[in-house]
Amino acid sequence: MTGAPWYHRDISRVRAEELLAHAGIDGSFLVRDSESVPGAYALCLLFQRHVHTYRILPDADGLLAVQATQGVQVNCFRTLGDLVLGYQNPNKGLVAPLLYPVMRESEANDESSDGDDEKPGSTFANSPPRAISPTATSPPSSSAAPHLLLQRLQELSPNSVGCEIVSLLDEYLHGNVCKDLENLKGGASGLQHFQGILSHICDSLHSEIDQTLSSLETLAKVFDHPSGHLTFSTMQNIGKSPEENMDNLLQKLTTLCNLLSSLEKRVLKALQEAVANHNLSLQPATPPESSRAPKKLARPNPVHSFQVKVVRYGRQTVSVDINEGVLLFDKKSGSFGVETVTLDRIVQLVKFQRGPAKLKMVVDSHHNPPRELVFESTKKREAFCRLLQLMKTTHSQKSELDVISVFVGTWNMGGTPPPGSLQSWVTCSGLGLTPDESISSLPHDIYAVGTQDNPQGEREWAEHIRATLRTSTNIDYKQVAVQSLWNIRLAVFVKPEHEARISQVNTASVKTGLGNTLGNKGAVGVSLLFNGTSMGFVNCHLTSGSDKALRRNHNFQDILRLLSLGEKQLSTFDISLRFNHLFWCGDLNYRLDLDALDILKHVSKREFEELMCADQLTRERHKRKAFFNFKEEKIMFPPTYRYERGSRDCYLWQKYKSSGVQVNGPSWCDRVLWKSYPESHVICTSYGCTDDIFTSEHSPVFATFEVGVISLFPRTESCSERASIELEAIEAIVKTSSKAKFFIEFHSRCLEEPRRSAENDSQYCEVPGFLKLGWSSKQLPKLHPVFSDLEHLRDQHLLLSVKSCDGFESYGECCVALRPTAGKLLDTFETCLTHRGEEMGSIRGRFRVYVPPDRRRIRERVYEWLSIEKDEREMMKDQLSPPSSSAFSIKAPSASYVASPNSYTNPAYFIFEEMPVFRKAEEIPSTIKESQVVCANNTVIQLPRVTGSHGHGKRSARRSDFTEIEIPGSLAPYKPSCETQSELSSAASSYQLFPGPHVPSTSPNQRHTTHSSNSSLQLQSHKNNMAPDSELSGKKLTNSYMNHSVFSRDMHKEKVRQDYQGVHQGRPVPIRNGPKLYPYVSTRVPAQCSASWIVEQPTPASGDNSLTALQIAKSLSEVDFQPADKKYPFHQMPSQQRQHGYDYGLASERNYSWEKEVSVLHGAPETVRELLSTLGLQRYTLDLSRSGWDDLDYFSGITEEELCAAGVSNPSHRRRILENLPKIWD
């Protein structure tokens, strides 16, 4: 059964539809495992461009039958093969007979290592390359024997198999076993290659036996008669053949057995003689005094001081006294002395994004002007905020916590024991984003420590970590769980005072090595509930090899789908949607696709941002092939692999083997990522690696997080009214070729049980391969939460799963936060649908949450006390961004093409707003049809070319009418996680779904005219910008996805002039720091590109560079042709600002003139180096940096005396600097 070529085992539904679409013939079919019923199958059949899925269920006797509606006769079959044969004839109940089987894809089971996993001192690294005898010359028995032995190896329990022996056996069974068999037939007396394996395995046993024999001889010398003790000589095994080594080992074992069997008798005889001759007696040992050490208390918090500049008050020293709960402002001058500010007087702290060292403190009242503090560095500011939060938590009157600190670490130990101290790892000391020394020793609430290639046992390793934590924090942490899969381990510890808050602890593991049967690669996981917050921790070791990125993606998808963690009622969802917070760490093994020498050059210059363009994980995340919707903090530390053991001075990127030189360029193999529910509070506070642990080729990596937690016990007093969640309408786009009906399943921890909707009442297939589904309020259930408190509901989430009515298989899942809607009358949501880690579509809806009036009390959280506010440019950008539509309706598709704001070229808009997509040429306006490139967000975007089989008589007999989208070379820019990690942002859709607000005064014809004229304006701007004075080479165009910022400066002058002429009444769009394609790639272009390889890189090799139509939607949704002032009124301010008495944004920024705005957006320096370069005084950069003037905010307050002291001796140069300082202090 399983050997049938049309049986595809556990492939996903989407992959099955893709294979059938590729086949393209009616009657094409395949069979896969059912995703909804264990042990069942799904028969997928292509007919008239649609995939029809039938469920095959086994009965009590094991007979198989296709599930049918009531009243239809059921035909039973013994095997899947019989069932397929039975339905190859027409009129058997299927929509078409099973005519053309779609064959299973060939899988390369090559799990050979690239040298990453070899242990130190292993001779396996120097073994000759694998030699496999040709099939023509090998006898049948020789080829059958290895296959049988490999099957036995796969069936072994992972606990009984060592990681290294797997590699040796794999090597032996794939080649050398055949040679041994042939040698036996040729008259050989032994298995030469097998003896080599035995010799290699027993290499370490020689030294162990020598050490054991030496210890036993010491015992014999002490207790035995001097003339009777045993002597032996250490036998050397170096340079001997495997057979001689085995003989040597057997001799040592014989000696060891003889000594062990006689030593106790010798000692007993010696003791008897000593008692008889010297009248000795054994006295009972006096009981020792209580050796139990007194319980260690956590170290007291000292008073921490910070040097700051307070605007309008000058330099001061601010001290934080956590124990007393006060701030001390020492002005150092004047008669005011030291000012004491108690904790209860601090109303709010506000951090600005563009002022990384600036902090605003609201004291006593929001109506008072806030105090503006500028710290020496961002690290100092973050330490100050952390201490204030700790002080507020310490002195809080509430019994439950609002925020905790979580440590996540990963380290590939390389098969060697760890050093005696791991303190630098658990205290986040080293390179990258590290905490200030004032808070580095503060203990975290939870520690999750993951390792790979760990040679120590579970108990030994866990005790080692606990001892390290005890030494560094003076706290005896409690072990929550330890989970292992071979040498992959994950240990979770918690503070003793939190032990009662931990519940529902689960552990699991998944094998991904050698066809998902061996645990040398795979993942382990631990999940827990901290009060009402669910957390998951995953530690994985993925496939190694620079060219194995696709297999690593598959490893991730298998782990996501198969790791059994969390609540059982959420088993419908993969683990990325089962937890409020999921932390994923491990040796992911994604490499840098770049020459090793180029990598070393950039690492030596600390140009990590440029290297991120070549990082495989970054690329795969952008293509949404792996870790979709996960976040990662900006990497500011050098690659953690592959170092020379014993130091961190150099990378060992070349390995000399008998088969040649193997190159492993430095890479960021060890990573920490996370994914949280929308509107959840989580901030990455550190991300780096150690620089003083040398025992492995990998450096340990650490990350810490500030995580908001939910109270477990809401108020429970009786209430006559219950809260309710009323769903008014939902629309979804699902990536499928099926014609089935669908329903939505709702899950939530605030509901007693899952609820289902009725079948969708509208369904359209306007784009081949996508279904547009709609549910009105009549089809949607009314949900009643268990608890009706607003305080409880604003932390809750709804999990939605779109399932088919025929097979009950999920076609996409998502998470929606109740927080933004609780207490309001109406709100909308929009987000993407995912399944098995892949993007499957999108969904939007409108719902209302009703809370009884007496249950609407809420309290301020500790993390809400410290807010993060965007600066004036960010606020302008938000005000000019498209707001979500407040209402929508489900209508029949319209025949006419009507353009609406922001919906010109986005396929998602066409599907949602009843507009035709690029299907027929006559339906497309000429401005769109002729456009090859458009300008969007400071980037040139190549429009996709959509081809289909709608031509007249051009339909291939082997192809069905599925739309094929050719992906442009310029991928869509997106905002990296590092720019949004500190915001409380929901997991919105990856592409815009809602159109801009409706303009009543504009008729459809006028809107269409406006669209055409504006698109013509943009295209003309592009043509002008491609003039010889700013001409870009073809290489730059083809590689614009790596460094798209090369377009912004070249095209800026002409674009600004034309935009100003065309929309002179509108405000300029602040696009200086537009969204980036890859995280951390600078949008500023230096005079000479420091990373020439970005532009001159050759065309990528052919492979999987595809994006889905949904990703094209995101690319095109960023094209905006409407004037900004007509769509998004500039005067609108966030509601959060209006509700306070004092406007934290700079009011003067609202009155910027056009000329001033252009100069600010495109000429203002962002660093001290840029400012000095603009003034032609870059020679002073190093001297000023050495004197501590490396932060622009801090530098803007410099005086002439301080300039002179820093080395600016020329008076005219000092005057030029002072006259051009940024005006940020007023």
Swiss-Prot record:
Residue span of region Disordered: 106-144, 945-964, 985-1035
Places the protein is found: Cytoplasm, Cytosol; Cytoplasm, Cytoskeleton; Membrane; Cell projection, Filopodium
Keywords on record: Actin-binding, Cell adhesion, Cell projection, Cytoplasm, Cytoskeleton, Hydrolase, Immunity, Lipid metabolism, Membrane, Nucleus, Phosphoprotein, SH2 domain, SH3-binding
Chain positions found as Phosphotyrosine: Y909
Motif extent (NPXY motif): 906-909
Positions of the SH2 domain: 6-102
UniProt keyword annotation of Transport present: no
Annotated protein name in UniProt: Phosphatidylinositol 3,4,5-trisphosphate 5-phosphatase 2B
Protein source organism: Danio rerio (Zebrafish)
Native organism taxonomy: Eukaryota, Metazoa, Chordata, Craniata, Vertebrata
Gene: inppl1b
